[in-house]
């Protein structure tokens, strides 16, 4: 799972879809000003989906992702942007780790999956200067 080749990584996570104990994850994005549906990573066998959309009209961007890890799998996620914090996606059980670098924003993701998401990492870029 990585930034699509040739795309602008800044709007990478326009829309995040997470299912179950994070059985699958999907990132829709914008390429050359056009919305693109990302690929689903993992297995989509759960009946519910949780979405998190970024609002680019107010320059919303992801600052961090808190991950819950247990039994070899990502159990849940909480996304923090420069404007708000998401509700729990998945389950808030297990050991936590946070994808975050001070003074930077998340512009893409990478990871691995088996039956569920087993690892998640992030690509970072400097924050844009305030206008």
Swiss-Prot record:
Keyword presence, Ligase: no
InterPro entries the record matches: Jacalin-like_lectin_dom, Jacalin-like_lectin_dom_plant, Jacalin-like_lectin_dom_sf
Pfam families (alphabetical): Jacalin
UniProt entry tagged with the keyword 4Fe-4S: no
CDD domains according to UniProt: Jacalin
Top-rank taxon: Eukaryota
Entries under PROSITE patterns matching the protein: JACALIN_LECTIN
Tissues where the protein occurs: Expressed in the vascular and surrounding tissues in cotyledons. Detected in root apical meristems.
GO molecular function, one term: carbohydrate binding
Stretches assigned to the Jacalin-type lectin domain: 1-126
Gene3D superfamilies xref list: Jacalin-like lectin domain
Record keywords: Lectin
A biological process term (GO) from this entry: defense response to virus
Family: Belongs to the jacalin lectin family.
Name of the featured protein: Jacalin-related lectin 15
